[in-house]
């Protein structure tokens, strides 16, 4: 927005600091440091630098290192000791968390049990399992029906679409800085796009849907995040046409709802009507 260019730089610098200090961008400082959020930082860096009148390459190199480090937080299954985002589909990631057992039990007792009408007297191990999935949702839309309460069992459309764009941005940044020609990153992005299409595209629905790798099926809940492959430009023309054709399922008087409408009561933060 006009007049907010300096604030944009401040926001990017804040995220650089977070990544340098913690190895990732937390959901919030302090209480939210046991999970991250859907990655947009890489695109923020490129957007800011492209519009900056003074091209500070020293700053860009520092920003590039932070973008690469955050990318590895999401994708490095061997070296990431903070959080496990691996899935059975090599090359596609999931949301997660790195909270401790005591915090998860407390989260179940104080938040989830009342909100979702869950049983009080269940083993601590079950509380930890349920709370872990729900806490992982904080890395995306917070509580939402897309994952059936099993967030870490799904390969999400939004996360992997954004990681595709990170690979494109990292290639661009390396070309700007003279590190490489960026082709290796282009190949990574192309590979990810092919995997997203293979596992997350539903020809039956004409939409991109989160993929349940445990039960080997798509989520039964359609979400407006289906547009993200269009936004980043890797959806085919045929896919784009079908998605646009199906977008009315998200229409509401106030704009687009996050998830398709359901006959079930809305207990999530982002169900239909949100």
Q: In which residue ranges do the predicted regions lie?
A:
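Extended, well-ordered alpha-helical scaffold segments
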Residues: 4-15, 55-75, 166, 177-196, ...
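Long, repeat-rich segments with strong aromatic
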Residues: 152-179, 185, 191-194, 273-274
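Extracytoplasmic mature domains of secreted/periplasmic and thylakoid-lumen proteins
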Residues: 34, 67-87
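Aromatic- and histidine-enriched alpha-helix N-cap/loop-to-helix transition segments
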Residues: 32-43, 62-66, 154-166, 220-224, ...
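Sec-exported extracytoplasmic/periplasmic mature domains
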Residues: 20, 50, 72, 76-79, ...
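Aromatic/His-enriched, Gly/Pro-containing loop or helix-boundary segments
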Residues: 18-63
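Extended glycan-interaction surfaces of carbohydrate-active proteins
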Residues: 8-28, 84-157, 191-274
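Well-ordered alpha-helical scaffold segments within catalytic/enzyme domains
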Residues: 1-5, 40-55, 161-180, 228-238
């Amino acid at each position: 927005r006009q007049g907010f260019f300096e604030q944009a730089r401040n926001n990017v610098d804040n995220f650089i600091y977070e990544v340098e200090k913690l190895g990732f961008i937390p959901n919030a400082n302090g209480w939210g440091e046991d999970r991250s959020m859907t990655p947009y930082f890489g695109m923020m860096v490129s957007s800011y630098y492209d519009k900056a009148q003074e091209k500070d390459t020293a700053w860009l190199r520092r920003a590039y290192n932070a973008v690469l480090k955050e990318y590895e937080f999401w994708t490095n299954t061997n070296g990431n000791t903070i959080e496990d985002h691996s899935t059975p589909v090599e090359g596609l990631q999931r949301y997660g968390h790195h909270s401790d057992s005591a915090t998860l039990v407390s989260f179940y007792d104080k938040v989830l049990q009342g909100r979702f009408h869950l049983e009080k007297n269940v083993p601590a191990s079950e509380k930890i399992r349920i709370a872990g999935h729900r806490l992982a949702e904080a890395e995306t839309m917070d509580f939402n029906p897309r994952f059936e309460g099993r967030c870490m069992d799904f390969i999400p459309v939004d996360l992997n679409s954004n990681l595709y764009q990170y690979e494109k941005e990292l290639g661009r940044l390396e070309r700007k800085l003279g590190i490489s020609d960026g082709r290796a990153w282009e190949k990574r992005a192309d590979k990810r796009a092919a995997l997203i299409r293979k596992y997350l595209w539903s020809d039956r629905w004409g939409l991109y849907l989160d993929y349940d790798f445990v039960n080997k099926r798509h989520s039964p809940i359609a979400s407006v995040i289906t547009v993200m492959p269009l936004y980043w430009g890797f959806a085919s023309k045929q896919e784009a046409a079908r998605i646009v054709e199906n977008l009315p399922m998200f229409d509401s008087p106030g704009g687009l709802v996050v998830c398709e409408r359901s006959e079930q009561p809305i207990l999530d933060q982002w169900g239909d009507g949100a």
